[in-house]
């Protein structure tokens, strides 16, 4: 691509709301988009890990993408995750995302039959990206879920040569040293988005501008404050605010992360429903304990300040 757009802000990894029977609650999506817009979010990552993309059917993923894009196009940057265990199905999702008006696409590595090398991964991503040649393509690096890890910088060196629409990486791993290398590769040519919310301040110190995160759905104002303090050179205030974010994340991840975060959304007035098996919603006892712990650190009070 001739010009790569560099993200400066927070992109929320959107949850997919479900009805009690497990069907997708499409009607709630516009309200979620409005909520995120009001919190200062810059974009939405659709049908990723947080959105239970791998647990949705192809048709459901397409309909979710259409509904979210329709609700927020022109106001928020729309990145559709198209990763799938089948490269052919991922390519279909990529083509659909382009037709639906997405601003970019992203894909994880195949997670059943895994790539055998960096070159093999690049070949897979080349096939997927070709499904939407008019959209920027981001490789989604999340080894904790795909079970596949390799040198991301080596991947970028290959991808820039054989993927015409390669734009960058969604880097969701705690290896900040490698993230820094990727971020500054070729003078910072590519848009490398950081995906570990609890490392947001360290990532900023390395030069990060854009980030994609799950807790941005309900805690964006806290992270935006971190950024504000950091950019103003008020490092102690940034550290203090970031420590609160870390404390919040620590509470949430005591429980299965996606069900727990859906529970937090319910506490804020957005009933996201259950999760798709094998994920399950928090039992009432855990829901109440999560609420108690968040209340104890002043989460709800601070959010309303």
Regions found by a protein language model. Name each.
Residues 48, 109-110, 173, 196-197, ...:
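Short secondary-structure boundary segments
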Residues 29, 61, 65, 90, ...:
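A general structural signal for well-ordered alpha-helical segments in protein cores
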Residues 38, 201-305:
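Structured C-terminal cap/extension of enzyme domains
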Residues 82-85, 173-174, 195-198, 218, ...:
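Short beta->alpha linker loops
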Residues 2-148, 304:
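Active-site beta->alpha loop and helix N-cap motifs at the rims of alpha/beta catalytic domains
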Residues 66-73, 95-98, 129, 160, ...:
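Surface-exposed amphipathic alpha-helices with a cationic face
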Residues 104, 110-116, 121-209:
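Ligand/cofactor pocket segment of small-molecule handling proteins
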Residues 78-81, 167-171, 212-213:
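Short catalytic-loop micro-motif centered on adjacent basic/acidic residues
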């Amino acid at each position: 691509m001739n010009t790569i757009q560099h993200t400066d802000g927070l992109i929320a990894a959107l949850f997919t709301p479900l009805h009690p029977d497990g069907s997708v609650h499409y009607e709630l999506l516009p309200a979620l988009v409005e909520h995120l817009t009001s919190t200062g979010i810059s974009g939405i990552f659709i049908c990723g890990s947080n959105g239970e993309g791998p647990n949705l059917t192809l048709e459901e993923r397409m309909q979710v993408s259409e509904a979210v894009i329709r609700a927020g196009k022109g106001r928020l940057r729309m990145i559709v995750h198209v990763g799938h265990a089948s490269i052919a199905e991922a390519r279909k999702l990529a083509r659909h995302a382009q037709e639906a008006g997405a601003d970019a696409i992203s894909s994880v590595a195949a997670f059943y039959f895994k790539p055998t090398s960096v070159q093999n991964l690049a070949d897979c991503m080349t096939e997927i990206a070709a499904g939407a040649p008019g959209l920027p393509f981001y490789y989604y690096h999340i080894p904790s879920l795909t079970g596949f890890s390799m040198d991301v910088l080596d991947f970028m060196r290959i991808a820039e040569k054989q993927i015409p629409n390669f734009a960058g990486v969604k880097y969701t791993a705690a290896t900040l040293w490698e993230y820094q290398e990727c971020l500054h590769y070729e003078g910072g040519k590519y848009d490398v988005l950081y995906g570990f919310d609890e490392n947001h301040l360290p990532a900023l110190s390395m030069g990060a501008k854009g980030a994609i995160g799950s807790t941005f759905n309900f805690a964006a104002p806290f992270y935006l404050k971190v950024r504000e303090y950091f950019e103003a050179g008020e490092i102690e205030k940034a550290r203090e605010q970031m420590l609160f974010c870390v404390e919040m994340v620590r509470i949430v991840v005591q429980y299965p992360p996606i069900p727990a975060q859906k529970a937090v959304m319910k506490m804020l007035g957005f009933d996201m429903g259950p999760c798709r098996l094998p994920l399950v919603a928090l039992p009432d006892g855990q829901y109440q304990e999560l609420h108690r712990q968040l209340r104890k650190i002043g989460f709800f009070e601070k959010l309303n300040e």
